[in-house]
Amino acid sequence: MKRDLLSGGEFKRILLVEDDAELAAMLKEFLEAYCYRVSTVANGVDALKAVMERAYELIICDVMMPKMAGDAFYYAVQRVKPELCERFIVITAHGDTQRMQEFFGHVSGMVLMKPFHLEDLLQTILLLFRELEDSRRRLTLPDEASAVLPFPTVTGIPPGLQT
């Protein structure tokens, strides 16, 4: 029931980038209960390797991490797999700095401030997937489009083409 209701009947693959091992384990367990497949890494360097090796439907990324911070990781992903940037949820407790405010202005996905309730994370994920699906639908014409935008009917041969 949870699977059909919350993940659209699919197992979506999520990359969770979080250096706090306890928080990462808790988030992984929570998301897997809703039928998401979650891979975890503790820093941006390992996250970039993971992105290059496997396809993910979503990235959830902390900002303050060792080796490569979340903002540097986001910009690296933007260079190598830009389509992933709209499927990014940035999580942070440090959103009040000038640097972070500038970074948030560049994020194509969403930002979630720590501390947050697990349900808020789930709702953010669902909202992001819903917005992506809506934008995909807008890019394709529905079957009814031919009724709304009919092609002209040719009823005769134009004079210049008559033999």
Predicted feature locations:
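Acidic, metal-coordinating helix/loop segments flanking the phosphotransfer/catalytic sites
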Residues: T40-L58
